[in-house]
Amino acid sequence: MDLLVPPSRDNSVVTFRLDTIGAGLVFADSLGKLTAALKSQGDGGTVVVQAPPGTGKTTLVPPLLANLVGERRRGQPRVVVTQPRRVAARSAARRLASLDGSRLGSRVGYTVRGESKSGSDTMVEFVTPGILLRRLLVDPGLEGTQAVILDEVHERGLETDLLVGMLAEVRELRGDLTLVAMSATLDAARFAALLGRSADGGAPAPVVDCPSALHALEVQWVPAAGQRLDDRGVAYSFLNHVAETTVAAHEEALMVNPDVDALVFLPGVREVSDVASRLRGRVQAGVEVLELHGQIGPDAQDRAVSGREPGDTPRIIVSTALAESSLTVPGVRLVIDSGLSREPRRDAGRGMSGLVTVSCSKASAEQRAGRAARQGPGRVVRCYDQQAFAAAPAHQTPEISVADLTSAALVLACWGAPGGRGLALPDAPPRAAMDDAVEVLRELGAVTVEGTVTDLGRTLAKVPADPRLARALLDGSTLVGRRLAAETVALVAGDQRAVGADLTKLLAAVRSGSHPAARRFAEDVKRMESLARQETSNTVDRQRIDSQRALDVSAREAPGFVVALAFPDRIARRVPGQGTPTYLLTSGTRAGLPAGSALAGHDWLAVAEVSRTQGRDAAGTGAVIRSAAPLSAELAAAAAPELLVEEVTARFAQGRVTARLERRLGALVLSMTPVRPSAEQGRHAVATALEKAGLSMIGWSAAADALRRRMALLYRELGDPWPDVSESALLARLDDWLAPELESMATGAPATTIDLADPLRRLLPWPEASALDSLVPERLQVPSGSRVRIEYPEVSDGSGGPDRTNMEPDGGSPVVAVKLQECFGWDRTPRLIEGRVPVLFHLLSPAGRPLAVTADLASFWSGPYSQVRAEMRGRYPKHPWPEDPWTALATSKTKNRM
């Protein structure tokens, strides 16, 4: 039987003509293997399809499944196909409907956010992953759907990963549901193992591999002279290099084949617009430059991905990763690759998430290159060198590993798998990121303490936006009106870029209808208004709303207020005294504004998006505000009452405890008033200062330091009962020796009035304390009669009890610095602590300069003294330098005064 031509059957459903649809498509040769793999599993089944981009899998597999399902159930089939992007879903549906010869929206249709062309007779429906996720939450059994195809699973989008796990569970309840995962890269075995867990006793799902359809592909390396990235992001010099390389390569290609179109890959919308603008000023007359990214309108997107007739105007299509794998752009024989891509990143420490520019993976680079050789020989020009390619990761980072998981956590809670527990996901979500996401949901009231979903959580999950925005839609509808709340949420949830980060200007543009996204925005607003109308009365926080109802929020202030309701941790106030506008957020994060932003004149902002960057716009903060709306101080406080606190803050500074009454909104100090601290507040301030600065916050007087050194030597040599007076030991037993002084400071006494010598004596053991002066005297009487101060060793932290290892002349011994002449006749070195510790003598010249260091006076007199005498007697003739120091009179005087 010819698999491309379905058998005639006596039913009303007209099947797809696969022979017509598959004409010229490489994957047509693999339909037999796919059919056999599915039929071998009976009703339903799971299969993984592995085929490079451009082979026709997205065009052929859906109608094949529709035919097989229709044949099996003798009725109209329904096959749902996910595409990672809206433009890809529309393009795939349009192409299949065209090949089928049917009207788009009848047998073949699509549904994306804000737009649907499908009906009851639709057999193949292309949708974005988010659409299917929300359908699953409403209808976990997917009644009326016989097959699901997850396309481009290799991209590892967060929503697609969730669908892999959730649909595997659906198949455990619905054995008749056919599930196919399609990948463009060599990672099929991973998904085969996951999807096979729920089928055939856990055996991997069969893999249908389609060989590459590449024609000859020339790879050219044209690296830029400088770096691709600088502290502002993608370097302008590199963008200029990409533009110049594109013009040169396309002109060269047109000389050989006038029908060659070029496809240029850049990481983001800004770079696409920049390079497209440069190209328009440099290309030959008659060459059209088109942009392809998520912020242009659907018509412009569709025009860019549509082919052209031979002889029509040659095109250069400048695209984000949108055209990497989920779209085939007809006519492309030349690819210019920047080698860069954007990936989500989450900064838990600063409460930020966003996109960062990184080198694309090897898999992405190969897919981009392959776009040039799908329909004939092609060429890829890589604007980087082979070393950079070799250093690139093999695959792009799974989004679940690096993205904000708040929306995903809500989906999982609604599914009955809080935190993803028990769900067979390609990669488990990071524990810390998931815990943070669940905590956000708890604060919203979307989940319980245990993590199970609440009624409010199920309502928030219906809104196609971040749960925080969904909650702001419901609360904001009551406070500012459904229309204004819906407009703000639709704008922030969309992917339109706010020039200068100014959301109010962007809102005015989409309202006017002149913006490319105006039509989709209007649809989103309409849908969100409807959701707000249905759900507000049952789910709003009445107590909170009643406290805010008295606010007079103007239409101009409404966007900022709604954003602040959604993201109270991102309410920001300008930091005074900064040349470049810098804002402090309630979360404690600092961020800059894009240069020239009209928002710079506002003291308060409600920030919808803030991301990491090291560019000029960050103003040295490491972050930049990407979208925000003005806010007043009053509305800021009203939007985040849970962050508003009045607190007395006491601190120990400049030697005493001071306090002030602070009124704060998160990290933002609204007002400060000096107050008298309570005793408890003072104690806390003193304890905090001690924890940070130790006893140096009080200071050691000379007397206290000397006593502490003597006590430390006793502890080192004798141990208990002599106390350990190291810093850590003293801090550990403050109540035993310093409690009265600490209480005095806590109630306002300055530290300068406290001498630690007397408190230290409280630690001396009794009756041993009476022997302190004899064991470790303050002074030592020398033969001249002088009483010379003994310099005891500095106290080391954690001295640890008896230890004789630190007795060398390196700072571990007690030292007496005395003039040499005062020690004549001293034949034995004095020892302290009952003879345990020798005194180290620093013998000085008459001018007080060191002549010798010794712990053995007898050896010094017998040896080195004669050399010292020979050198010094001429320099100091007025002082005695006897030949026999043993019998000479010790003196502190000159010879004339003796």
Predicted segments, located by residue:
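Conserved helicase core region in the C-terminal RecA-like lobe
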Residues: 130-131, 317-322, 339, 565-566, ...
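Long, charged, glycine-rich C-terminal linkers/tails
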Residues: 106-112, 562, 581, 787-789
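Generic recognition of stable, solvent-exposed alpha-helical segments in well-folded globular domains
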Residues: 33, 56, 60, 87, ...
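P-loop NTPase motor module signature
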Residues: 1-472, 534-548, 795-797, 804
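Acidic, serine/threonine- and proline-rich low-complexity intrinsically disordered segments
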Residues: 2-5, 483-582, 587, 603-779, ...
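Short conserved micro-motifs at the rims of enzyme active sites and ligand-binding pockets
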Residues: 137-138, 229-230, 347, 392-395, ...
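Amphipathic alpha-helical packing elements
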Residues: 582-586, 590-593, 693-700, 772-800, ...
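Short, surface-exposed, low-complexity cationic segments
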Residues: 596-618, 794-832, 837-839, 843
